[in-house]
Amino acid sequence: MSNYPLHQACMENEFFKVQELLHSKPSLLLQKDQDGRIPLHWSVSFQAHEITSFLLSKMENVNLDDYPDDSGWTPFHIACSVGNLEVVKSLYDRPLKPDLNKITNQGVTCLHLAVGKKWFEVSQFLIENGASVRIKDKFNQIPLHRAASVGSLKLIELLCGLGKSAVNWQDKQGWTPLFHALAEGHGDAAVLLVEKYGAEYDLVDNKGAKAEDVALNEQVKKFFLNNV
């Protein structure tokens, strides 16, 4: 990273170095490194909050959507994955707001990322501001698949309640969120999907298996069948 001193300073949380570098060479603000990232990507990633605020103060007329890295991640994607709500808000509450539904190269939205990391407050903020719960990634999965996989009851309720998510959407292997909940051993999440949100447990995947057939173990399977 020696060719990218500002990026390095952001990673190492060297605030005065960042100020000094930008004062001497303002064009470094939007310089891309070998990963296609601008300095803001790294300050957000390394949670260098003071530096992030400083960089944003210099970027009032910059649309963050115009700066995806080589994987299609903008600084806002990173913020939602890291999960600090105040940082997410600081990147969103600007004259040029980021597109909440912008996807990465893998078809992943900020909501997919926040849900997958169990960041409830960030996920709620995104949905309240209009993020779609129905965008499918390259595996044909919507955010609810991820909520079910990590077994978060709160996120399932958020996505199905406030978000009005589809419940029986099948991914590329024919798995609905219910399959993922059972496969990861989250019997309580599976029961919630069926009992409160009407998930169909008789659907079969591409191999002809039902959700109960892919349960992590017999204990999870029995718990599920005894409660639906």
From Swiss-Prot:
Keywords recorded for this protein, A-Z: ANK repeat, Chaperone, Repeat
InterPro entries tied to this protein: Ankyrin_rpt, Ankyrin_rpt-contain_sf
Signal sequence segment: none
ANK repeats by residue range: 1-30, 35-64, 71-100, 106-135, 139-168, 173-203
UniProt xrefs under Pfam families: Ank_2
UniProt GO cellular component terms: cytosol; nucleus
PROSITE patterns, A to Z: ANK_REP_REGION, ANK_REPEAT
Name the record gives this protein: Probable 26S proteasome regulatory subunit p28
Native source organism of the sequence: Saccharomyces cerevisiae (strain ATCC 204508 / S288c)
